[in-house]
Amino acid sequence: MYTFRQLYRFPELALGTLLALITCSPLIFAQTPTIPTPAEPKIAIVLNSAEASVSLIDMQTRKVIKTTPVGKEPHHLMLTPDQKTLLIANAAGNDVQLMNPVNGELLGKIPEIIDPYQIGYSPNHKWFIANGNRLDRVDIYAADGANLKLAKSIKLAKTPSHIAYTSDSKTAFITLQDSSELAAIDLATQTVIWKMPTGNTPAGLWMTPGDQYLLVGITGEDNVQVIDWKNRKEVKRIFTGKGAHNFRPLGDKKHVFLSNRVAATISLLNMQTLEKEGDITGLPSGPDDMEITPDGKTMWVTFRFAKKVGVIDIPSMKLIATIPVGKSPHGVFFTPRAAWE
């Protein structure tokens, strides 16, 4: 019998079990050579979290052109503030891989980032957080350009998952998936200032424009919880589909997509009306992370249960292609891309 944490990190291990559970020292980045960002994205980078590898996909031919070994359990990724280096969080490898975001070339590692399941810079780029999903800890680093210095390691149970920030970079929010809570951290003091209960197994987080509401994907249920975080209360639930998980904004400051891992759908939400506007259906199982081309017309999606990546035509809300990749594909990235707003 798998533990819940194993199922969460690698949900395709036992899909039937997952369905049952759901329903009932300073660090310095390596110097990166400057490669101009193309006018259009050329290569999609996909993390195969159960294979310790990265698939590089030619976005024109939609074929895997290279599979590169990386550290154990690569789950999430993000750009450095100067946009020259892609950071890949190798959770079980206890390090962060450095990669050229344009061509997928490996550039080295940052060691001793312990259990980095999810990572993220604050909007002002002065703070960097690594969530230790397995070890129940949140590590907060002071960031000065490419330099990181551990400010504080906070024990935070149970199972810190995703991250969001206020636009002024004063507060970070962390979902605690196994205690079904949302935690707020004051970044100046690196202290937990409050917790509040959420629905079962919260995961993805997204802050609406103007820092008005915090959207929480309730993966153990079928909805997005809308939180008035200033008053620590629920405003409403937006019902989307079972396994409501992660967010990707369209880039128009109005709409955000949400992946529903168990329902195998993606919902389009209006952040102004707090209503669902539609669903993308007919998808392979386990839609998870998403990325959008800079013209806002095409979305790439990882399907964790199906070992595939999908390409979706946004105007028609239809799946137009799938590409086989490795086991448990999670993070996906390319540059340039639509704005995260």
Question: What residue spans do the PLM features occupy?
Answer:
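Predominantly soluble domains enriched in secretory-pathway, periplasmic, or organellar proteins
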Residues: I22, P26-E341
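Accessible peptide chain termini
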Residues: M1-Y2, K152
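Bacterial N-terminal signal peptides that target proteins for export
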Residues: Y2-T17
